[in-house]
A protein has these predicted regions:
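Residue-level signal for mature regions of secreted extracellular proteins and peptides
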Residues: 15-16, 53-55, 203-204
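Surface-exposed, low-hydrophobicity interaction/linker segments
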Residues: 45-114, 134
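Mid-length scaffold segments of soluble, non-membrane domains
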Residues: 106-155
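Extracellular/mature segments of secreted proteins
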Residues: 68-71, 134, 141-142, 196-197, ...
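Sec-dependent bacterial lipoprotein signal peptides
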Residues: 1-20
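Sequence contexts marking disulfide-bonded cysteines in secreted/extracellular proteins
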Residues: 21-23, 60-63, 129, 133-135, ...
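Helix-rich interaction surfaces within compact, conserved domain-sized segments
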Residues: 147-218
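Ser/Thr-rich, Pro/Gly/Ala-heavy low-complexity intrinsically disordered linkers and tails
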Residues: 18-52
Length: 218
């Protein structure tokens, strides 16, 4: 049975976040660039074959890799409720603006980071249940992100060196997760080998090849 997750905004005033003058931050919608970062739009990447069933690689804890059906993925207005078919989402309707390729300390609304996936990013996610944070998990995710080489389409002198987002997500079913366009990874712990393999294999899966930075404050 397919699970459906109805996502309401994690943040109370998303419009203010998008258009507010916090530190003068403005984020481009598709077709724009920020800080001179290189971007190339509409270079469609061939979709890889979907899995017949979820994979459970050997790991230090339970790991599941899956390929949910790709959803129609139009832009929707800020605040529009969106239903995704997987947790974490890996495609679907999303906001016109995406999150910057960086680490965030507070949750990024899913409707932003799905747009990052469309741009070929991998989003690294975690859920802390004790309220004290997950320093070991967060450092492990940083190490995974650091293991990726520089992306040749990114201008690291004025923007990100690659297309990776790290963010907490309290809606996750597991302590650790990752998403690429059309691919999901969930794990009960931080298993660095399997997560690094997932990120390496599915980086750049999006239908648009974009490395312009996005919104930096949430």
């Amino acid at each position: 049975m397919t699970r459906i997750f109805l996502f309401s905004a994690l943040l109370p005033h998303p419009v203010a976040l998008l258009f507010g003058a916090c530190g003068g931050n403005t984020a481009p919608s598709d077709g724009g660039t920020m800080d001179g970062a290189a971007a190339t739009l509409d270079q469609h990447v061939p979709d890889r074959a979907r899995l017949d069933h979820p994979l459970h690689p050997d790991a230090a804890c339970g790991v599941t890799i899956d390929t949910p059906p790709l959803l129609d993925s139009p832009h929707v207005a800020i605040g529009t409720p969106v239903t995704y078919d997987s947790n974490p989402p890996s495609s679907g309707p999303h906001y016109p603006v995406w999150a910057a390729f960086q680490e965030f300390m507070t949750p990024v609304d899913r409707r932003y980071y799905v747009h990052d996936l469309e741009h070929g990013a991998v989003v690294l996610l975690y859920r802390c249940d004790d309220g004290a944070g997950c320093p070991d998990i967060v450092q492990g995710l940083r190490d995974v992100a650091a293991s990726l080489p520089d992306d040749p389409i990114c201008n690291k002198s004025t923007g990100p060196r690659n297309r990776v987002v790290i963010t907490p997500d309290p809606l996750l079913p597991t302590a650790v997760a990752a998403a690429a366009w059309g691919w999901t990874y969930t794990a009960d712990c931080l298993d660095a080998p399997s997560l690094k393999a997932f990120v390496s294999q599915h980086y750049g899966e999006g239908t648009e090849v974009v490395c312009a930075n996005g919104q930096t404050q949430f």
